[in-house]
UniProtKB/Swiss-Prot annotation:
Signal peptide coordinates: none
Membership in a protein family: Belongs to the NAD-dependent DNA ligase family. LigA subfamily.
Name of the molecule in the record: DNA ligase
List of catalytic residues: 118 (n6-amp-lysine intermediate)
Pfam (any one): BRCT
Catalytic activities: NAD(+) + (deoxyribonucleotide)n-3'-hydroxyl + 5'-phospho-(deoxyribonucleotide)m = (deoxyribonucleotide)n+m + AMP + beta-nicotinamide D-nucleotide
Any one cellular-component term (Gene Ontology): cytosol
Cofactor: Mg(2+); Mn(2+)
PANTHER family for this protein: CHROMOSOME TRANSMISSION FIDELITY FACTOR 18, DNA LIGASE
Biological role stated in the UniProt entry: DNA ligase that catalyzes the formation of phosphodiester linkages between 5'-phosphoryl and 3'-hydroxyl groups in double-stranded DNA using NAD as a coenzyme and as the energy source for the reaction. It is essential for DNA replication and repair of damaged DNA.
Length: 675
């Protein structure tokens, strides 16, 4: 047999053997060989493919890593929308869900359920054609996500080719499988240790780490992050039909896709609640983070009969865990200054572990919130991760006070620039009005360079601080005058890093109107509103000349947003900034209309906000939802469609539950905004 034929036969044998061991390791959790033996097989395959490059195929295990970094993510449309789930926070709500299911199904027989741990990761959809992985996308807004195919192929838990040799049916001609990419606790801790040693910012939790790792423009970064995945369902399928959710999971497992081994068929809703209690009791001992249990009607036929509501299926519910809480001490209260000049008090805490995550600080929102909760320096407090993600101070332990606690008072001068701090009558926040405030300049630069704005890679927090503190950059327009020689003078900024940043800044000159408008940081103009304006007016000049009435004629743009845009372009300093950017050579391509019904969730809905939001003011949140076609109301009634609940929401949430109104916590609210 010629050498090439021998090599071909050995390559095929090695690929099949490696796929087999991947299946045993990632799906069955029963490895048969040591890591060293596996590495030996992999290295042999690499050597053979290097010797015979014509024999390399896209589904080879060696092809997971190596693609060049992309400049941006392409859209990934979902043929069947990836809906979110209705939440339940109590047994009563789960039993009510089961009652609704039985009412719709009538006397068709006893209903059994599939109960699955709710992974706290990033939702993804993988597309396999004739068994080979051809596409992968994030959930996005449920209709269109981001194409992360190249990155998904670097995750060893995701098979490049579905495994048909473990029994059961062969893979269909085309199937879209859905699941969660996650990072387990051990790998998360190791990643943060390495980032701390390198002087890089730490990830707040494993979910953020997983999302940030998958959504990398450079696949080699994703490959180095030890991501894993569990799969729980399917979207589009051709030529194949599943009978039950349990069968779906088993068949996915047989094809080589990891499924959560803790999932269980429950003959009754009472059994599903018992499963929840069992999982909740042992959640901290699991190697990965979960934030609840998803309960699904097991029969696929009955799922189809039950159908969907506008945002969620009627046949499933997410029974969420109560937030983790822990006791700690307030060491200090520091004030942060944002890009719009808002001063936000932040509690510096004695490090405490809350739900597997070390919490060192928590936002206190504003002076009113500090006074309402009476939070003082050196207080003993209870801290929780709201939505199991955002740290917040729940309450002060009053009986632990010794008399040595200090009352917090918002400073009269900006901690960054020393300018007078003001509180406008209609706002709950204090502001620094100095446009030359270093903290605001730094925050504006980070916003301008962010992925959804000018997308300048390499312009991180540390380099921004050095540029501003040394007086090299005083405005975003100064970025376009940076040279390699200037950057090389900064400590730790080697030649390659300097060249890469200058090249990234140069690439950002080719942008579009929507991204540019968002990058300017106009009050109330998020990325979605910026796109609406770009699609309606087409050019920057047209937006600058538009009146309040003309802006309000855009569907999704209200009076608050319109006046903010007009005010921005009326200020001489802003007009000078825009002209400086244009003079630097920025070129704006036409903005294409958005793909898919991205406003379907908010459009026409009546929304009520209650409680404090940590990520923005309620007025900003109201403006964002209004810009998407929603109507914001102050009171809950039968006409209310959605209640957004922040910290300490009060009676509105209970009334919403009684009326069966959809309730979103802050994390879900941000996800629905695509933030």
């Amino acid at each position: 047999m010629p050498d090439r034929e021998k090599a071909h036969a050995r390559i095929e044998a090695l690929r099949e053997e490696i796929r087999h061991h991947n299946y045993l390791y990632y799906v069955l959790d029963r490895p048969e060989i040591s890591d060293e033996a596996y590495d030996g097989l992999f290295r042999e395959l690499v050597r053979l493919e290097e010797s015979y490059p014509a024999l390399i195929t896209p589904d080879s295990p060696t092809q997971r890593v190596g693609a060049a970094p992309a400049e941006k993510f392409l859209p990934f449309p979902h043929t069947i929308p990836m809906l979110s789930l209705e939440n339940a926070m109590s047994e009563a709500e789960v039993f009510e869900f089961a009652r609704r299911v039985r009412k719709i199904l009538g006397d068709r027989g006893d209903v059994d359920f599939m109960a699955e741990p709710k992974m706290d990761g990033l939702a993804v959809e993988l597309v396999y054609e004739n068994g080979e992985l051809t596409g992968a996308g994030t959930r996005g807004d449920g209709y269109v996500g981001e194409d992360v195919t190249r990155n998904a192929k670097t995750i060893r838990a995701i098979p490049l080719k579905l495994y048909a040799g473990a029994g059961g049916a062969s893979p269909p001609a085309r199937i879209a499988v859905r699941g969660e990419v996650y990072m387990d606790r051990k790998d998360f801790a190791a990643l943060n240790r390495s980032r701390e040693q390198a002087g890089e910012p730490l990830f707040a939790n494993p979910r953020n780490a997983a999302a940030g790792s998958l959504r990398q423009l450079d696949p080699s970064v994703t490959a180095a992050r030890s991501l894993k995945a569990f799969f729980y369902g399917v979207g589009e399928v051709s030529g194949y039909r599943f009978k039950t959710q349990a069968q779906t999971l088993e068949q996915l497992r047989r094809w080589g896709l990891p499924v959560n081994p803790l999932s269980r068929v429950c003959p009754s809703i009472e059994d599903a609640v018992s499963f929840y209690n069992e999982i909740a009791a042992g959640r901290d001992a699991l190697p990965f983070e979960i934030d609840g249990v998803v309960v699904k009607v097991n029969s696929i036929e009955w799922q189809e009969m039950l159908g969907e509501k506008s945002r969620s299926p009627r046949w499933a519910i997410a029974y969420k865990f109560s937030p983790h809480q822990a006791r700690t001490r307030v060491l200090d209260i520091k004030v942060q200054v944002g890009r719009t000049g808002v001063l936000t008090p932040v509690a510096e805490l004695e490090p405490v572990t809350v739900g597997g995550v070390t919490v060192r600080r928590a936002t206190l929102h504003n002076q009113d919130e500090v006074e309402r909760k009476d939070i003082r320096v050196r207080d003993q407090v209870m801290v929780r991760r709201a939505g199991d993600v955002i740290p917040e101070v729940v309450e002060v332990i009053g009986e632990a006070r010794t008399g040595g606690e200090e009352v917090f008072q918002m400073p009269g001068q900006c901690p960054s620039c020393g300018s007078e701090v003001v509180r406008l009558p209609e706002e709950a926040v204090h502001r620094c009005l100095n446009r030359n405030c270093p903290a605001q300049i730094k925050a504006s630069l980070r916003h301008f360079a962010s992925r959804d704005a000018m997308n300048i890679e390499g312009l991180g927090k540390n380099i921004v601080s050095m540029l501003v503190d040394r007086g090299i950059v005083e405005s975003v327009s100064d970025l376009y005058r940076l040279s390699v020689e200037t950057l090389e003078q900064l400590p730790g900024f080697a030649g390659k890093s300097s060249r890469n940043l200058v090249e990234s800044i140069e690439r950002s000159k080719k942008t579009n109107l929507a991204d540019f408008l968002y990058a300017l940081g106009i009050y109330h103009v998020g990325s979605h509103v910026a796109r609406l304006l770009a699609e309606r007016f087409g050019t920057l000049d047209a937006v600058r000349r538009a009146s309040v009435e003309e802006l309000m004629s855009v569907n999704g743009v209200g009076e608050v947003v319109a006046r903010s845009v007009v005010h921005y372009f009326s200020l001489p300093a802003n007009r000078t900034l825009v002209e400086s950017l244009l003079s630097a050579g920025l070129e704006m391509a036409a903005t294409e209309p958005e793909a898919g019904p991205v406003d379907a969730f908010w459009n026409g809905k009546t929304v009520v906000f209650t409680g404090a939001l940590s990520s923005m003011t309620r007025s900003n949140a109201a403006a964002l939802t209004a810009s998407r076609g929603a109507r914001v109301s102050d009171s809950v009634s039968r006409k209310t469609d959605i209640v957004v609940a922040g910290a300490d929401p009060g009676s509105k949430v209970e009334k919403a539950r009684q009326l069966g109104i959809t309730i979103l916590d802050e994390r879900e609210f941000l996800e629905r905004l695509g933030m």
